[in-house]
Amino acid sequence: MNTLECLAVAVALAMDAFAVAIATGIRLREVSPRQTFRLAFHFGLFQALMPVAGWTLGLTVRGYIEQWDHWLAFGLLLYIGVRMMREAFEETEENDDRCDPTRGLTLIMLAVATSIDALAVGLSLSVLGIDIVTPAIVIGVVCLLFTATGLHLGRMLSRAESLGRRAALAGGVVLIGIGLRILYEHGVFDTAATLARSVLG
């Protein structure tokens, strides 16, 4: 894998993290350097480690992982997305500090959900016999940069007076949309449509 190919893969993998970071910035509205570091570091770290984990596993458990990885990502994003949408309608100041997506379990869940595709990439590179060290480093660094950028872009969007509460609501919708896209890309809806036709037909 040459440098250009490695960068292309890294950018593609960073898109979900970028979108989630924007949604997180919208949710927070005010972003501190510490929050930026936590989110970018964890997203970048998980994005770098997942390909290594996938590469290490190789063909041994590939079929098993591919059966449930997309459902795991969808479940995590759905849970956090619904939570953000619910809190968009709660107006107390206490709520502003109750769910900081850059801390605790929520941060880990987001990091895992946005790095599932990187696990699959690691599996693929293992099959192709490609060394994982350089791709993992590039993938992690690119994700870190995209996450930091997305977080502050979301913060700027949330400050627009015309957005208000709708911006926070949109953040939750974005997360759920990403989860649905993951299911779509794994053919879940095609399978469901086929089953429906067979039952109705």
From Swiss-Prot:
Keyword field: Cell inner membrane, Cell membrane, Ion transport, Manganese, Membrane, Transmembrane, Transmembrane helix, Transport
The source's superkingdom equals Bacteria
Molecular function GO terms recorded: manganese ion transmembrane transporter activity
Q: Where in the cell is it found?
A: Cell inner membrane
Q: Name one GO cellular component term.
A: plasma membrane
Signal peptide span per the entry? none
- Residues spanning the membrane: 6-26, 39-59, 105-125, 127-147, 169-189
Q: Fetch the InterPro entries from UniProt.
A: Mntp/YtaF, Put_MntP
Keyword Electron transport assigned to the entry: answer is no
Membrane topology, from the record = Multi-pass membrane protein
The free-text function statement in the UniProt record for this protein reads: Probably functions as a manganese efflux pump.
Q: Which family does it belong to?
A: Belongs to the MntP (TC 9.B.29) family.
**Which protein are we looking at?**
Putative manganese efflux pump MntP
Native organism taxonomy:
Bacteria, Pseudomonadati, Thermodesulfobacteriota, Desulfovibrionia, Desulfovibrionales
Q: Tell me the name of the encoding gene.
A: mntP
